[in-house]
Amino acid sequence: MRKTEFIDKACDPATLTAGQLMQDAVFTCTPRTDVLSIVRMMTTWNFGSLPVVEEDRTLVGLVSEYDVLQAVIEGRDLRKLSAADIMTRQVLSVTEDMNLVQIANLFQDRYVTRLPVVRGTKLVGLVARRDLLFGYVKACQYWS
Protein backbone atom coordinates (compact mmCIF):
# COMPACT_ATOMS: atom_id res chain seq x y z
CA MET A 1 0.00 0.00 0.00
CA ARG A 2 1.22 3.48 -0.79
CA LYS A 3 1.85 5.55 2.28
CA THR A 4 0.39 8.55 0.43
CA GLU A 5 -3.03 6.96 0.74
CA PHE A 6 -2.92 8.23 4.32
CA ILE A 7 -2.37 11.89 3.39
CA ASP A 8 -5.35 13.81 4.71
CA LYS A 9 -4.12 17.33 5.41
CA ALA A 10 -2.68 20.32 3.58
CA CYS A 11 0.75 19.64 2.16
CA ASP A 12 2.88 21.23 -0.55
CA PRO A 13 3.15 18.29 -2.97
CA ALA A 14 6.78 19.16 -3.79
CA THR A 15 7.75 18.53 -0.16
CA LEU A 16 6.52 14.94 -0.08
CA THR A 17 9.37 12.55 0.72
CA ALA A 18 10.30 9.08 -0.43
CA GLY A 19 9.28 7.86 3.02
CA GLN A 20 5.77 9.19 2.39
CA LEU A 21 5.55 8.14 -1.26
CA MET A 22 7.07 4.66 -1.14
CA GLN A 23 5.42 1.30 -1.02
CA ASP A 24 6.78 -0.57 1.96
CA ALA A 25 5.42 -4.04 1.14
CA VAL A 26 8.11 -5.04 -1.34
CA PHE A 27 8.75 -8.31 -3.15
CA THR A 28 12.45 -9.18 -2.92
CA CYS A 29 14.82 -12.03 -3.60
CA THR A 30 18.16 -13.11 -2.15
CA PRO A 31 21.45 -13.51 -4.01
CA ARG A 32 20.79 -17.28 -4.00
CA THR A 33 17.32 -17.09 -5.58
CA ASP A 34 17.29 -18.88 -8.92
CA VAL A 35 16.66 -16.71 -11.97
CA LEU A 36 13.64 -18.69 -13.17
CA SER A 37 11.89 -17.98 -9.86
CA ILE A 38 12.74 -14.31 -10.27
CA VAL A 39 11.34 -14.28 -13.81
CA ARG A 40 8.16 -15.96 -12.58
CA MET A 41 7.71 -13.29 -9.90
CA MET A 42 8.44 -10.49 -12.37
CA THR A 43 5.98 -11.76 -14.95
CA THR A 44 3.28 -12.78 -12.47
CA TRP A 45 3.28 -9.47 -10.62
CA ASN A 46 4.29 -7.27 -13.58
CA PHE A 47 7.57 -6.03 -12.07
CA GLY A 48 10.39 -4.77 -14.25
CA SER A 49 12.93 -5.37 -11.51
CA LEU A 50 13.37 -7.05 -8.15
CA PRO A 51 15.60 -5.87 -5.29
CA VAL A 52 18.17 -8.39 -4.07
CA VAL A 53 18.62 -8.36 -0.30
CA GLU A 54 20.49 -10.33 2.33
CA GLU A 55 18.55 -11.92 5.20
CA ASP A 56 18.88 -8.69 7.24
CA ARG A 57 17.36 -6.62 4.35
CA THR A 58 20.73 -5.18 3.28
CA LEU A 59 20.31 -4.14 -0.36
CA VAL A 60 23.03 -5.87 -2.40
CA GLY A 61 21.70 -5.60 -5.94
CA LEU A 62 18.82 -5.43 -8.35
CA VAL A 63 17.73 -7.90 -11.02
CA SER A 64 16.01 -6.17 -13.93
CA GLU A 65 14.40 -7.40 -17.11
CA TYR A 66 17.48 -6.03 -18.84
CA ASP A 67 19.77 -8.24 -16.71
CA VAL A 68 17.70 -11.34 -17.53
CA LEU A 69 17.56 -10.55 -21.25
CA GLN A 70 21.32 -9.90 -21.30
CA ALA A 71 21.89 -13.39 -19.88
CA VAL A 72 19.63 -14.84 -22.60
CA ILE A 73 21.52 -12.93 -25.32
CA GLU A 74 24.80 -14.29 -23.93
CA GLY A 75 23.44 -17.84 -24.23
CA ARG A 76 23.44 -18.49 -20.50
CA ASP A 77 21.10 -21.16 -19.11
CA LEU A 78 18.67 -19.34 -16.80
CA ARG A 79 17.95 -22.62 -15.01
CA LYS A 80 21.53 -22.66 -13.70
CA LEU A 81 21.83 -19.02 -12.65
CA SER A 82 21.12 -17.22 -9.39
CA ALA A 83 20.38 -13.57 -8.75
CA ALA A 84 24.03 -13.05 -7.75
CA ASP A 85 25.12 -14.22 -11.22
CA ILE A 86 23.22 -11.56 -13.15
CA MET A 87 22.23 -8.76 -10.75
CA THR A 88 23.32 -5.16 -11.06
CA ARG A 89 25.48 -4.50 -8.00
CA GLN A 90 25.76 -0.71 -8.20
CA VAL A 91 22.15 0.12 -7.41
CA LEU A 92 20.81 3.65 -7.63
CA SER A 93 18.67 4.21 -4.54
CA VAL A 94 17.06 7.02 -2.58
CA THR A 95 16.76 7.76 1.12
CA GLU A 96 13.50 8.27 2.98
CA ASP A 97 14.06 12.02 3.34
CA MET A 98 14.55 12.80 -0.38
CA ASN A 99 11.71 14.94 -1.71
CA LEU A 100 9.46 14.48 -4.72
CA VAL A 101 11.42 16.89 -6.92
CA GLN A 102 14.77 15.22 -6.16
CA ILE A 103 13.32 11.79 -6.90
CA ALA A 104 11.59 13.01 -10.08
CA ASN A 105 14.92 14.39 -11.30
CA LEU A 106 16.55 10.98 -10.78
CA PHE A 107 13.74 9.29 -12.70
CA GLN A 108 14.13 11.71 -15.59
CA ASP A 109 17.94 11.80 -15.63
CA ARG A 110 18.56 8.07 -15.21
CA TYR A 111 15.60 6.68 -17.19
CA VAL A 112 14.44 4.40 -14.37
CA THR A 113 10.89 3.64 -13.32
CA ARG A 114 11.37 2.35 -9.75
CA LEU A 115 13.96 3.07 -7.09
CA PRO A 116 14.76 1.25 -3.87
CA VAL A 117 14.35 3.34 -0.71
CA VAL A 118 17.03 2.65 1.88
CA ARG A 119 17.72 3.51 5.49
CA GLY A 120 21.49 3.19 5.69
CA THR A 121 22.07 -0.01 3.72
CA LYS A 122 18.68 -1.61 4.52
CA LEU A 123 15.82 -1.74 2.03
CA VAL A 124 12.70 -0.14 3.50
CA GLY A 125 10.58 0.31 0.38
CA LEU A 126 10.31 1.09 -3.31
CA VAL A 127 9.16 4.25 -4.99
CA ALA A 128 7.89 4.25 -8.57
CA ARG A 129 7.17 7.11 -10.95
CA ARG A 130 3.49 6.36 -10.52
CA ASP A 131 3.83 6.72 -6.72
CA LEU A 132 5.11 10.28 -7.25
CA LEU A 133 2.14 11.12 -9.45
CA PHE A 134 -0.31 9.49 -7.05
CA GLY A 135 1.16 11.37 -4.08
CA TYR A 136 1.17 14.66 -5.96
CA VAL A 137 -2.49 14.37 -6.91
CA LYS A 138 -3.48 13.21 -3.42
CA ALA A 139 -1.63 16.12 -1.74
CA CYS A 140 -3.12 18.63 -4.21
CA GLN A 141 -6.60 17.71 -3.00
CA TYR A 142 -5.81 19.41 0.30
CA TRP A 143 -3.31 22.08 -0.74
CA SER A 144 -4.18 25.46 -2.21
Name the predicted role of every residue range.
Residues M1-S144:
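Tandem CBS (Cystathionine beta-synthase) repeat/Bateman regulatory domains
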